Swiss-Prot record:
Keywords tagged on the record: Activator, DNA-binding, Repressor, Transcription, Transcription regulation
Signal peptide: none
UniProt xrefs under InterPro entries: CcpA, HTH_LacI, LacI/GalR-like_sensor, Lambda_DNA-bd_dom_sf, Peripla_BP_I
SMART domains in UniProt: HTH_LACI
CDD domains referenced in this protein's UniProt entry, alphabetically: HTH_LacI, PBP1_CcpA
Protein name: Catabolite control protein A
DNA-binding residues: 5-24
Taxonomic path: Bacteria, Bacillati, Bacillota, Bacilli, Bacillales
Protein role: Global transcriptional regulator of carbon catabolite repression (CCR) and carbon catabolite activation (CCA), which ensures optimal energy usage under diverse conditions.
Sequence ranges assigned to domain HTH lacI-type in this UniProt record: 1-57
Length: 332
């Protein structure tokens, strides 16, 4: 049977209000009374109900995190950053997996609010106008992590994805490549069509190189789609000599697909990935990759959310963290 605040009050011979003050750390309790209540709580095994406490304090010290795919290394690292900062500031986490499904994302958002969370960290590859309208209506603060929305109405923590793509392609151009392909994630997602593709094209254009539509191949973030993409690119009359890939997992597929065709990476084909996940060091040759600081994005997003929840001063609601390229053996 669950022990209630009433049971604690009765056993300790104090009022329920006194038990509540002790549980919530209110200093207006005599030390002897506090000691007696805490001993009773320990003896009975009482566990305060966060939601019930929230009804009184209007805070549950709980944060909702909506994540597209917890099995993905990228999002798992983000979640670690979120949780570490949440723990530091004494918040609990409710984590929900949306499977990158818009209807499920909106359902989870409303579900989180029903649990009376104090704030929400939201991640999605495709933040639509409908998302923005729902997020704006949220009664608690919301911060986007590694997710973009074009209006900048929702606070967010990201990197400059367009510039990161530009830098990756520019490094291949600087190595002498003229035939550079791009294997993208799902093109309907703004992070790809509005950012990474734009950076890829800008690097080529500014260097006076042609932009070939056939050199832009859409994948679905999986290893298999990387294999399929490189097979398609190697059918081109003028084959690419370098490929920029939108994620590390697809890049592994590109490397293995090229090797299956008898090509040597990097002598015949140089490859750069994106995200610098652990996968980049698990392949041979090891993968050169754009470093997106996943843990830091999660940590900074959680810290930004704590500022909003506690009504602290926020210098900027749109935070962009620095990126860099980690050069390994898939490039010369």
């Amino acid at each position: 049977m669950n022990v209630t605040i009433y049971d604690v009050a009765r056993e300790a011979s104090v009022s329920m209000a006194t038990v509540s003050r002790v549980v919530n750390g209110n200093p207006n309790v005599k030390p002897s009374t506090r000691k007696k209540v805490l001993e009773t709580i320990e003896r009975l095994g009482y566990r305060p109900n966060a939601v019930a406490r929230g009804l009184a304090s209007k805070k549950t010290t709980t944060v909702g995190v909506i994540i597209p795919d917890i099995s993905n290394i990228f999002y798992a690292e983000l979640a670690r950053g979120i949780e570490d900062i949440a723990t530091m500031y004494k918040y609990n986490i409710i984590l929900s997996n949306s499977d990158q499904n818009q209807d499920k994302e909106l359902h989870l958002l409303n579900n989180m609010l029903g649990k009376q969370v104090d704030g929400i960290i939201f991640m999605s590859g495709n933040v639509t106008e409908e998302h923005v309208e729902e997020l704006k209506k949220s009664p608690v603060p919301v911060v986007l992590a590694a997710s973009i929305e074009s209006t900048n109405q929702i606070p967010s923590v990201t990197i400059d994805y367009e510039q990161a793509a530009f830098d990756a392609v520019q490094s291949l151009i600087d190595s002498g490549h003229k035939n550079i392909a791009f294997v993208s994630g799902t093109l309907e997602e703004p992070i790809n069509h509005a950012k990474k593709v734009k950076g890829y094209k800008r690097a080529l254009t500014e260097s006076g190189l042609p932009v070939r539509d056939s050199y832009i191949v859409e994948g679905d973030y999986t290893y298999d789609s990387g294999i399929e993409a490189v097979e398609k690119l190697l059918e081109e009359d003028e084959k690419p000599t370098a490929i920029f890939v939108g994620t590390d997992e697809m890049a592994l597929g590109v490397i293995h697909g090229a090797q299956d065709r008898g090509l040597n990476v990097p002598n015949d084909l140089e490859i750069i990935g994106f995200d610098n996940t652990r996968l980049s060091t698990m392949v041979r040759p090891q993968l050169t990759s754009v470093v997106q600081p996943m843990y830091d994005i999660g940590a900074v997003a959680m810290r930004l959310l704590t500022k909003y929840m506690n009504k602290e001063t926020v210098d900027s609601s749109i935070v962009q963290l620095p990126h860099r390229i980690e050069f390994r053996q898939s490039t010369k």
